[in-house]
Amino acid sequence: MLVNVSLAVAVAASLLGSAAAAPLVAVKQLVERKVNASPDFNITFSSSHTDGLPRTLIMATGGTIAGSSASATDSTNYRAGSIGVAALVDAVPQLLNVSNIDGMQVSNVDSGSITDDIVLLISKLANKALCGSDPEYDAVVVTHGTETLEETAYTLDATLMCDKTVVVVGAMRPATAISADGPSNLLEAVTTAVSPASHGRGVLVVLNDRICQALYCAKTNANALDTFKAYEQGFVGGPLSTKPFFYYPPSQPTFKTVYDLSNVTSLPRVDVLYSHQMATFDGVNASVANGAKGFIGAGTGAGGISPWAKQNLAYVMSQGIPVVASTKINNGVVAPDEDPAAGSYISSALLNPVKSRRLLQSL
């Protein structure tokens, strides 16, 4: 049920060549499974079992980390989601020194094509893999395109029902690039995921030798390798020689709430409205007619919305449709409105518009 409360409270040849360094020990090769190991997971590739190593489920969704281009120097014009999970793992044999690996292909698309159904499926699979009475896995790693990575990572953080570790990882350069960052990112992600020191920290994002909590982490640059950051809160750690080094003991935000989606079959439609000078949001009624169940205002400053837009939003709120006031700046706090006459907007607190959308869908 959507409730009107403050969210502050509710709340590839080149690839193979680049990673073909000799492993530290003899590495078991991937083998194709003829029969799925579990009816809950569509496992298509699995490493041979090594006693004493933890077990990691890699859910691949596509993205730049699985992308390919005709040129090894081209890191902008490429096809995302060209390489499957088996090739990703096989390109980094060092992975099998730190964990036994099962891989499943949830999707193989650019992250702009990730749907609510895919995200809901990943959440349910992660909970099945880690949070049951007899979990099959010790950790989950999700490979993902970077454009919407923070949305999926935050959704998992808000819906994972145990303190096991999920790491979401991507790359800023395709697998075929001469300086592809995917192999090292994947190795660091799996190594971080299976580390006991990672437990109790929520879902983590690992890229570019940095470890970031999903609740705070956001993409800050369209092209640079060091794009995922948490400006206000900072990183929680970074891999040193692939092994995670954390700056602080495990902790969770004081306002964090986890939502159980196990009985949810679909997420409601919530639209994000981008504010600007003289914004009207005239299309909200059409959105409602087409099934929108809520709106996020990506406002100016600390959630500012123009008076013309407020008129349209006041009308949809009068129909019981929730509206969250957030900020397109992506940093800072949108506080609850203390003026009752101003309307009943929900405060996004410190969540940016896309994370506010995911939380509103989960309430």
Regions found by a protein language model. Name each.
Residues 53, 59, 67-69, 84-95, ...:
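Accessory alpha-helical/coil subdomains and C-terminal extensions
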Residues 72-81, 148, 154-167, 182-188, ...:
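A glycine- and small-aliphatic-rich helix-loop capping segment at beta-alpha/alpha-beta transitions
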